[in-house]
UniProtKB/Swiss-Prot annotation:
InterPro entries: NHR-like_dom_sf, NR5-like, Nucl_hrmn_rcpt_lig-bd, Nuclear_hrmn_rcpt, Znf_hrmn_rcpt, Znf_NHR/GATA
Regulation acting on activity, per entry: Activated by synthetic agonists RR-RJW100, SR-RJW100, endo sulfamide compound 6N and GSK8470.
Ranges of Polar residues composition bias in the record: 1-10
Protein's name according to its UniProt entry: Nuclear receptor subfamily 5 group A member 2
Length: 541
């Protein structure tokens, strides 16, 4: 911040748990934007003991054994980076034993315990750390961990003869095939994600859209407005204040899948999941995007992805809130003050951004971060999240030759294209090309939520206090997405890589959108008390 007073205001806000986005940032004339009460405020987030066990501490830091390296697919060595580690103790695995890959030591321990019907007790609190160096200290906790990661009691022979009950053969065969696919994919693709730097420089002189699009206004009049049933969504209501639709998440410790993703070093952060998932279909209800490619059962969805789905907002409720807000905006204006179509679109995008911020602040992992890190991540990716949200809406709901709005209305694409300026037309064209690519890939809801988290937890953001957590989330989500695509789309061997290659395209479109929005803002077409502009100023500061 440029002045002592601005810094003092910001520090005072932080003391009370609130930080204005864009406060003290310069406007187009170089003057600081005051920290008005109408700006979005972020609450001071205290780190919860969320359980990638209890070792995050006050700083929200990840435990040492989860300090993972940045996810890259350049020069990936299968032997080094995809080497299997025992899920019980972290030692090198020797093969499939009693339901999953384990080391020789844990195999023998599990077999002796079951065959001899041993009963152990723990002299501590039944949460002893089990690793290669101290796996023999507490047999009780070691055996419990064997069971929790999926070793099967029924696979041990009761007659003490060598060799287990080989009823898991098909599962082992499938798991081996999956690993070979991973190895081939990683070696073949050699992906390196780089953000595209091409941004169209030409700015349009003006934007006028045909009155045919004005059906947005008339359609909104037909929707019954029930303010009692809808929480307020205006600028005086911060999306960082708990609302009736805020999501609640169980502690990490209760999530079975995290034992695979979050408890071991980076080379073990892979979702092999030899046994079926326990999550029920009801655990992913509440999200209305029903994609055409929904063929996978919960048994083939990594547990981490199921938890990401739980963070998703209720789309009909978001749609109703935005429509109610637009109704109220129009009702409060006289005939001569009615919003232009462009102004209406800006309000629509602005309210969509509010819902995205609400989603982020209630999401798993993100809420573990301190306020400063949350602000930096959101300021970095807000436009990408908006574009991704729009793109996915078109993939799922859009019809050929039309644009599907967040309010649930279809607008003729050709009308917008014929009336828009050069830059907006180009931007829309690129967006439609991306929609077509994702449709051809059969882009689905599970992949959508993974990409959202990959965009939000960007490794490009500098000066993060808890970069290790961001890095860990990137690797976990990448691993879950890889497993999901391999398991559910085996015929599309390159799908994982193709999805990742869409991220630079989303970044390029978002950069174009930011430039266009800033141009319209300089022309006075977008008001200051707008979250889009506050975010834009914060990113450019």
């Amino acid at each position: 911040m440029s002045s002592n007073s601005d810094t003092g205001d910001l520090q005072e806000s932080l003391k009370h748990g609130l930080t204005p986005i864009g406060a003290g940032l310069p406007d187009r004339h170089g003057s600081p934007i005051p920290a008005r009460g109408r700006l979005v405020m972020l609450p001071k987030v205290e780190t919860e003991a969320l359980g990638l066990a209890r070792s995050h501490g006050e700083q929200g830091q990840m435990p040492e054994n989860m300090q993972v390296s940045q996810f890259k697919m350049v020069n990936y060595s299968y032997d080094e980076d995809l080497e299997e580690l025992c899920p019980v103790c972290g030692d090198k695995v020797s093969g499939y034993h009693y339901g999953l890959l384990t080391c020789e030591s844990c195999k023998g321990f599990f077999k002796r315990t079951v065959q001899n019907n041993k009963r152990y007790t723990c002299i501590e609190n039944q949460n002893c750390q089990i690793d290669k160096t101290q796996r023999k200290r507490c047999p009780y906790c070691r055996f419990q961990k064997c069971l929790s990661v999926g070793m099967k009691l029924e696979a041990v022979r009761a007659d003490r003869m060598r060799g287990g009950r080989n009823k898991f053969g098909p599962m082992y065969k499938r798991d081996r095939a999956l690993k070979q696919q991973k190895k081939a994919l990683i070696r073949a693709n050699g992906l390196k994600l780089e953000a595209m730097s091409q941004v169209i420089q030409a700015m349009p002189s003006d934007l006028t859209i045909s009155s045919a699009i004005q059906n947005i206004h008339s359609a909104s009049k037909g929707l019954p407005l029930n303010h009692a049933a809808l929480p307020p969504t205006d600028y005086d209501r911060s999306p960082f204040v708990t609302s009736p639709i805020s999501m609640t998440m169980p502690p990490h410790g209760s999530l079975q899948g995290y034992q695979t993703y979050g408890h071991f070093p980076s080379r073990a952060i892979k979702s092999e999941y030899p046994d079926p998932y326990t999550s029920s279909p009801e655990s992913i209800m509440g999200y209305s995007y029903m994609d055409s490619y929904q063929t996978s059962s919960p048994a083939s969805i990594p547990h981490l992805i199921l938890e990401l789905l739980k963070c998703e907002p209720d789309e009909p409720q978001v749609q109703a809130k935005i429509m109610a807000y637009l109704q109220q905006e129009q009702a409060n204006r006289s005939k001569h003050e009615k919003l232009s179509t462009f102004g209406l679109m800006c309000k629509m995008a602005d309210q969509t951004l509010f819902s995205i911020v609400e989603w982020a602040r209630s999401s798993i992992f993100f809420r573990e971060l301190k306020v400063d890190d949350q602000m930096k991540l959101l300021q970095n990716c807000w436009s990408e999240l908006l574009i991704l949200d729009h793109i996915y809406r078109q993939v799922v709901h859009g019809k050929e030759g039309s644009i599907f709005l967040v309010t649930g209305q279809q607008v003729d694409y050709s009308i917008i294209a014929s009336q828009a300026g050069a830059t907006l037309n180009n931007l829309m064209s690129h967006a439609q090309e991306l929609v077509a690519k994702l449709r051809s890939l059969q882009f689905d809801q599970r992949e959508f939520v993974c990409l959202k988290f990959l965009v939000l937890f960007s490794l490009d953001v500098k000066n993060l206090e808890n970069f290790q957590l961001v890095e860990g989330v990137q690797e976990q989500v990448n691993a879950a997405l890889l497993d999901y695509t391999m398991c559910n789309y085996p015929q599309q061997t390159e799908k994982f890589g193709q999805l990742l290659l869409r991220l630079p395209e989303i970044r390029a479109i978002s950069m174009q959108a930011e430039e266009y929005l800033y141009y319209k803002h300089l022309n006075g077409d977008v008001p200051y008390n707008n979250l889009l502009i506050e975010m834009l100023h914060a990113k450019r500061a």
